[in-house]
Amino acid sequence: MIISPPILHAHIDTEKDSDWVNRMMSVDPERNFPMNSGRSWHGGVHLNGNLSETVRCIADGKVISIRQPEPAENTVPPLNYNGVTDKGYVLIKHETEIGSGEEGKIVYYSLYMHLRSIDSNVQPGNTLYRKEPVGAAGMVDGQNAFHFQIFCDDENIQKITGRISPETDLNKDGRTDVVYGDSHFYLPAGTPIYGDMPEENSLANNSPVQRTSVPLYVTMSFDKGNCTMVTRQQHEVLSDTYTEVGSPLINADGKDYEYNLYSYALQLYPKSPSAGYEMLRFGRVVNTEYEELVPADAPLWRTINTPQGKGVVNLGARDIRVYSDGDFPHWTGWKLVNDDADTNSQCNSPTILCTTRNDLSRMICHFPLEWDSATVESRFEWLKSPNDVLSKPMTEPDLDLLIEHCKALCLVDNPLPARRVWHFDPRQFIAHFRKCGWLGENDIISVVRRYQNAYPMTSELTRPLSKDTLIERIISQGQNSSGEVIRPAGLKNELSKSLRKYLITTPLRIAHYFGQMARETGRFASFIENGDSSYFDMYEPGTEQGLKLGNNVVGDGARFKGRGTIHLTGRENYRNYGKYRNPSDDDFFTTEPNNQLPVENAYFSCDAGGYFWASKQKYIIVSHRLTPSGSLGVNYWADKGCSLSDAREVTRRINPAADGFDLVRWPAFEHSWYVLNDEITPPLN
């Protein structure tokens, strides 16, 4: 899922992404979410702007309803009710993916109301792509602003949040088909907290112990090499509020904790490093079809804050529950609100009216869509009766004026069912899903460059990579003319699972990864190193390359040719990957035909690439000795930036000779980076 705000301006260095989203969406406090100042439901927010501000599409989607503005009408009734008001709008339906399987496929809608003008490309049935212009901000009640909202139906609220209940179910772990963002842990009262880490990651801990007296909620997040642990507890009086315990702990259990997850997995989980990597990354094993933790109850010891001070806890203990941002944990503010049973526009929700929290932006509220002309009269009927909002009830003529104004703004030929929908604060929805990082089919299509080479030849210009061909490549097995498998089936989901596991989830990291894959796989065409039999002689025992790769048996050159999303090459690398996956059988991938798995099995093909990415260390010569330079893993180098030199440095971690950098890797990176970032001016290529 790729998403951004409807207003786009440059990021500021060191600015948090959520802060940038809020800066892009300056909200009128009188027209906020989920209520306006008159205590009526308000399904979106009014974004303050100016008449020259371009409103942009937040994500790829299809235009399903539109109304052109009429400047001559906005100064007179019924549009001019409290001031000049524009009636132009665009309604977009977004179909995207946030995880694997059917539960990972979601539908939501975005509405851009009170537009002064609408871009000529915006037509019913047309597809709009993220960052494309929708139109220009107009006027609302005499103020420069436009209304913006995001909502979904009943079926999709369960897919999006994983539940229909107000709060997270604390009796079971969170979803495994939709996992993204931070990891969260529920520690019931009575959880043992120890004074020190046990030796060798032992399940037994003989250091002093005390037990928690109240439930605790721990969040584990990764960012640019750091791992941050935050503990919360429920407020003793304000039951709807969860307060932080102590200050966030950053890298309390090791320097550059995120970058070093691979080395920690080898150290702490010597019998199953790959599954151990998932424990460190997710707090649990997620890919259970291919990963098995040994022993099954291997612990996850982490330092956290408690009301009594810092302590060490086994977050892998049986009684502790594990979730991700994909479960919308209620202790981080997310709550489903569905307790206003009437059908009028007045907010009568006890949850909203009686809450003790000041911030309602993570309330997901179920109430009628305010733009349905068929329900306008019934939604505003309450204004004729005594109420707490108006000093006296509205007269029939006054109410008629309001109703005519509302009808003039309602959707034309409303394509949506006349029922309640689930409303999100659009700032929170966008900020939340910018942490998702899951690439669906259409996302992969967008991120892959149409042309392989920076300067394509005539043959490629006339036959660029088509959408249908790319879909076939990420779904179906591929074979060469000799019947040899060159590409596994089922790459789409397994690639996103691998990117998620190895924390290749930020736009910059994903762009660098796809830049490398463009050369390594020919844009998903072949996941095996190309060449005739004589080509691989340069990798044979006794050659310079063969010695570097640990090839010591005749035939190793072809036997251990490059395979995977990022090519695993050479006997030593195949053996090391085997040690990482299953140390009890470290020759698994060096034994034929298992050496073929990184090209025949989509999971191993993608996982081998992720393993290579996470385990790669740069070395330099210092005083005639090879010395590590920089942190472990390619993510460290990817985080450096998006310049030509940054991309070249990443490339040298994958291919020391930087093969194909200028012609393929760099233009592929530039393309992917533009698709994923928030710039509105594309690169020249």
Question: Which residues does each PLM region occupy?
Answer:
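Extracytoplasmic
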Residues: 42-44, 58, 87, 107, ...
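Surface-exposed, glycine-biased beta-strand/turn segments
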Residues: 1-88, 93-101, 129-130, 137-139, ...
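Acidic, glycine-anchored pre-beta loop/turn
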Residues: 119-128
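Active-site loop architecture of trypsin-fold serine endopeptidases
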Residues: 137-147, 151
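Substrate-binding/active-site groove segments that recognize
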Residues: 464-468, 472-473, 561-580
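Substrate-binding clefts and substrate-entry loops adjacent to catalytic sites
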Residues: 574-600, 618-637, 648
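Conserved positions in beta-strands of structured domains
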Residues: 62-64, 113-116
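Cell-wall glycan-active module
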Residues: 1-34, 103, 119-120, 150-515, ...
